[in-house]
Amino acid sequence: MNNHFKCIGIVGHPRHPTALTTHEMLYRWLCAKGYEVMVEQQIAQELQLKNVKTGTLAEIGQQADLAVVVGGDGNMLGAARTLARYDIKVIGINRGNLGFLTDLDPDNAHQQLADVLDGHYISEKRFLLEAQVCQQDCQKRISTAINEVVLHPGKVAHMIEFEVYIDEVFAFSQRSDGLIISTPTGSTAYSLSAGGPILTPSLDAITLVPMFPHTLSARPLVINSSSTIRLRFSHRRNDLEISCDSQIALPIQEGEDVLIRRCDYHLNLIHPKDYSYFNTLSSKLGWSKKLF
């Protein structure tokens, strides 16, 4: 064992027995190598582990040096919103579909992870968005997002009329099905499907992507990540929502605005030493291949 990491947390909500097997193999492998291991409570219960140190996501964030998320991108997003609040590094083993954020191949995870534990890794700081639903600047509901904050109708699809202010200066108005406000991390997710640009992870930028705008001139807009975005609504309705990473929904009531800004904290995401963002674009999303 080395001194790069002492306590390692195992997190992620398994959707099938294969993923659960990966959790168990990882736990026993780390214990055999002499690491202190914390297991998320739900995983420990499902594996029926005895005499194991367990904790919530927050407790793992407070006590562990590294969190290994086993699952797909959804598992990573759910865990990352909590773990980003703490001084902990995060890496993922892919047991989902795409696995854009979970780098490690489950069939070769032990060797890749061994290299990471020896200190051979690439570190990135990924910023989050904070979304507030407020009335007269009095905060009412708040959440965070790694990928994106999306304005959309609640249950029935319909046109929304709204205004967008950037740093309290009017930017544009729009009639559309909604708006995607994305981080660079989220630029390869929902934003990409809506025609948004790909932003490399190190950019300090936020992209605003219209969803089915009722105009021929609407285009995605890229702004500085230090900007504050305010959404105001002209026709008051009680069925609008914002969703964070497609996992948390906040309702918007009549007379309320939405404020979106960069979080004060960030996610410490790490990758194997041979990680390449552009190779990931190619292998996961079919980005153009080399010609020679």
From Swiss-Prot:
Subcellular location: Cytoplasm
Keywords: ATP-binding, Cytoplasm, Kinase, NAD, NADP, Nucleotide-binding, Transferase
Cofactor(s), names only, from the UniProt record: a divalent metal cation
Active site (catalytic residues): 73
Enzyme class per UniProt: transferase
Reaction catalyzed: NAD(+) + ATP = ADP + NADP(+) + H(+)
A GO cellular-component term linked to this record: cytoplasm
Major subcellular site: cytoplasm
InterPro entries per record: ATP-NAD_kinase_N, ATP-NAD_kinase_PpnK-typ_C, NAD/diacylglycerol_kinase_sf, NADK
A single GO BP: NADP biosynthetic process
Gene Ontology MF: a single term: NAD+ kinase activity
Record-listed E.C. numbers: 2.7.1.23
Coiled coil, from the record: none
Binding site for NAD(+): 73-74, 147-148, 158, 175, 177, 188-193, 247
UniProt family annotation: Belongs to the NAD kinase family.
Annotated function: Involved in the regulation of the intracellular balance of NAD and NADP, and is a key enzyme in the biosynthesis of NADP. Catalyzes specifically the phosphorylation on 2'-hydroxyl of the adenosine moiety of NAD to yield NADP.
Name of the protein: NAD kinase
